[in-house]
Swiss-Prot record:
Keyword Cytoplasm: yes
CDD domains: Sigma70_r4
InterPro entries from the UniProt entry: RNA_pol_sigma-70_dom (IPR014284), RNA_pol_sigma70 (IPR000943), RNA_pol_sigma70_r2 (IPR007627), RNA_pol_sigma70_r4 (IPR007630), RNA_pol_sigma_r2 (IPR013325), RNA_pol_sigma_r3/r4-like (IPR013324), RNA_pol_sigma_RpoH_proteobac (IPR012759), Sigma-70_Factor (IPR050813)
Subcellular compartments: Cytoplasm
Biological-process GO terms, alphabetical: DNA-templated transcription initiation; response to heat
Pfam families per record: Sigma70_r2, Sigma70_r4
Residue segments, region Sigma-70 factor domain-4: 229-281
General function of this protein: Sigma factors are initiation factors that promote the attachment of RNA polymerase to specific initiation sites and are then released. This sigma factor is involved in regulation of expression of heat shock genes.
Protein name, per record: RNA polymerase sigma factor RpoH
């Protein structure tokens, strides 16, 4: 796919800010739109569908790339690597498995960025085993202060990451070395420890990016449907719902609203109940 589908490129634009602005202009896909496009790609090899899927997910690659800003590498390069992972994910995604594409793609995006960081950071052969790679990406986020870990902190990190205390101390020493220059480790040196971006992916236990994005998308979707549903109500019913449920400062009482409209509190309750039924139907449809 990477040879056939041309997508937005940081290099082509020559400006990272311009790239980010343009990437964010592409509309996000609804569940229905995404499913239609992924099926067109999977069952009909529709490259136009693939292009739309990729372009609509570029913003997620940008978001993920920012988590790797502490390694001294250009964000533009991290984004390009993440885009490769995104394209691989789009090609391999099965629309029938019941999850959103972004949930599936996070693994591939992080995997490509991880491999790029490991190959291009300043330390020679800083992480050649699975436990070392895990430490490489997680060690600095576990540091609560500058300086070396004490023994208690070493044991805590080792326990949380499932590695030995000796591995933690060795990796801390490697990452603290200032006089070691970069020299990408050759493939023949890795042997069984070869980094495989398609198979290895470090989980960030502090957050779930995919779930967060899906929740954010759902919140925006629900808010939009609620706004449209409110417009279908008459003005008085709309104002009652807003006063009772949408006022951020306070929830108005039935009696206060009744006084404003010169009607009984019971009548306000009836209007509120009817309006809520109409909103429920409008949102569900």
């Amino acid at each position: 796919m990477t040879n056939k589908v041309q997508i937005l490129s940081v290099t082509a634009l020559g400006n990272l800010d311009a790239y980010i602005r343009i990437a964010n202009l592409w509309p996000m896909l609804s569940i229905k739109e995404e499913k239609l496009l992924t099926k067109r790609l999977r069952y009909h090899d529709d490259l136009d569908a693939a292009k739309t899927l990729i372009l609509s997910h570029l913003r997620f690659v940008i978001h993920i790339s920012r988590n790797y800003s502490g390694y001294g590498l250009l964000q533009a390069d991290l984004i390009q690597e993440g885009n490769i992972g995104l394209m691989k994910a789009v090609r391999r995604f099965n629309p029938d498995i019941g999850v959103r594409l972004v949930s599936f793609a996070v693994h591939w995006i992080k995997s490509e960025i991880h491999e790029y960081v490991l190959r291009n950071w300043r330390i020679v052969k800083v992480a050649t085993t699975k436990s070392q790679r895990k430490l490489f990406f997680n060690l600095r986020k576990n540091k609560k202060r500058l300086g070396w870990f004490n023994q208690e902190e070493i044991e805590i990190v080792a326990r949380e990451l499932g590695v030995s205390s000796e591995d933690v101390r060795e990796m801390e020493s490697r990452m603290s070395a200032q006089d070691i220059t970069f020299n990408p480790f050759p493939e023949e040196d890795l042997k069984d420890g070869k980094i495989n971006g398609n198979m290895f992916y470090l989980q960030d236990k502090t957050s779930n990016f995919a779930n967060g994005l899906e929740q954010d998308n759902w919140n925006k979707h629900t808010t939009s449907k609620l706004s449209n549903a409110l417009l279908r109500l008459d003005e008085r019913s709309r104002n009652i719902i807003r006063a009772r449920w949408l006022d951020k400062k306070e929830k108005n009482t039935l009696q206060k609203i009744a006084n404003n409209y010169g009607i009984s509190a019971e009548r306000v309750r009836q209007l509120e109940k009817n309006a809520m039924k109409k909103l429920k139907i409008a949102i569900e449809n």
